[in-house]
């Protein structure tokens, strides 16, 4: 059986010419030359979701904006990531994400390292055209470790995918459809798993938080040190957040 090597592909992104391997996702091709395309649902190593629509880009000869996280590069592709049409589309998506998002950044554990917060500053979506009353839902404690603040959730599905595809546990899923869709644990109102914390770590906002960390410190007050995980006998390397030590 012969191994067939795919030829490299030449594309242009924001006027920069680059050569990348065939089959590369456009979002990764942009990243390789320092062009950061925003995205909430995309995460390397996980299946493609295309849910948040924040990575929209303009591709020459295509009638509509395309999602960079699901588009594979093609020879001669000409891409624009920062034209006004793209920025306005991203701003509109942010307004929808913020429609029911609580304004609790000062007390949210993700404040200061929240990807939604960063994108709001970057695209100036601080003022919304929507005047509807926000739907408030009480926070839920799924386990001694995992807390879920539903109004903060932006339905990026990162937690569901990392739990299933990354950890092979499948303790998280979804319920309902459309605007009523939400993340749910495997036992309706509580979570039965090994409590590895991957869902908390991968959450781009403050929807999933740790019981040991909640409301105790701020991200910029922490320093990080390498250590060995004591969760089981495998001895995996991990990074520990430390304060006042």
Can you name each region flagged by the protein language model?
Residues 3-5, 234:
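Short acidic, Pro/Gly- and aromatic-enriched capping/linker segments at domain boundaries
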Residues 14-16, 148-149:
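Extended, non-catalytic structural segments that build the interaction scaffolds
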Residues 20, 193-194:
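Ordered, soluble secondary-structure elements with a strong preference for glycine-centered loop motifs
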